[in-house]
Amino acid sequence: MKKILLVLVICLLLATSCKNEPNPFLVKKNHIGLLTDSTQVKDLDAIFANDSVVRYIAGDEFTGSVNTIEIFDKGGIKLLDLSPVDALDSTSVISTVRIIDDRYKTEQEISTLSTFGDIQNAYKISKIDNLINSVVVSVDKINASFTIDKKELPSSLRFKTGEQIDEVQIPAKAKIKFFMLHW
């Protein structure tokens, strides 16, 4: 009887100790770690309880600007920039997440340390936008856009903003400057 009770206690301990914790650095289409597309601004302090949440209050309601919320880890390293749908509204959801830290990775291991070639191998590219100082590569599968500095492009493409840039024109070794998720 004692052996059965001991086995039962051990099984219960093993079952309760095997929690399946979500990866706080996993990037998917509708969430980043515990942050989801339905997370409200008021919930950020609970989600990032071990980190630092920095909110800037614009103070000028006439500007209509969105207040960026910055997330830093306990060591002071910047992790994320969050933009809510409505500025100064604690019930607003997050619309855009700018991923700064290289620990954040997609299921295909794409991070800020990745290259354009890595993105091409992992995802189907939906669109490429040619901006003044950068190129933005959009991937609809994960609602992400990857920004590449034009310094990574051949010199013939660096100063042309009106022309469409094709996938084949971007070098595979071009580094990602940062990437964003749009919800």
Where are these regions (language model features)?
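An amphipathic alpha-helical core segment
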Residues: 133-149
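Short acidic-hydrophobic surface loop/beta-edge motif
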Residues: 6, 69-72, 137
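Long, compositionally biased
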Residues: 144-161
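Short helix/turn-capping signatures at newly exposed starts of structured segments
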Residues: 18-132, 142, 160-183
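Bacterial Sec-dependent N-terminal signal peptides
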Residues: 1-25
